[in-house]
Amino acid sequence: MSVNNHKDRPSNVPVLRRAAMDFLARREHSIYELKQKLFTKYPDSTLRDLQTALDELRRENLQSDRRFAECYVRYRKSKGFAYKHIRADLFSRGVHTDIVNDYLSSQDPDWQVMANSIIDKKIPNSNEIVYGSKQHRRLVRFLESRGFLLCEIQEAVYRNIKLIST
């Protein structure tokens, strides 16, 4: 973004606003995401014009980080991602901690249900796995990569798989 705020330069606010609305028409965006996308698309825009366009959208409730967080959490949960992963994603998209905490809780009982469901899908026919085996380690790593807490992983493995020690 150009910090060059020339007074003789025409305002770019309507163009920025229209572009932001086009992005928002496709899906909800955090304010941080919109800033990044608009900066990439219109690198010569002034900071003032960009901020003015985004402030207007927020004032008119066309952009809301709360709405974005709510939609994002629901979407990522539907794709099998859990607390730690979704939380990190929201922070990387510039969503404030208070908003993240309002829409995401590590105590949500859905996480355990999701972990159980994932194990059922990953190992549908086999209910016995050797503890510490390649298959066991792979399953634990997969659940960790999805953002499940260790206690959820252990509980899901314990409930759904008979671990055999060698």
Region roles according to the model:
Residues 1-166:
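An alpha-helical, amphipathic repeat domain used for nucleic-acid recognition
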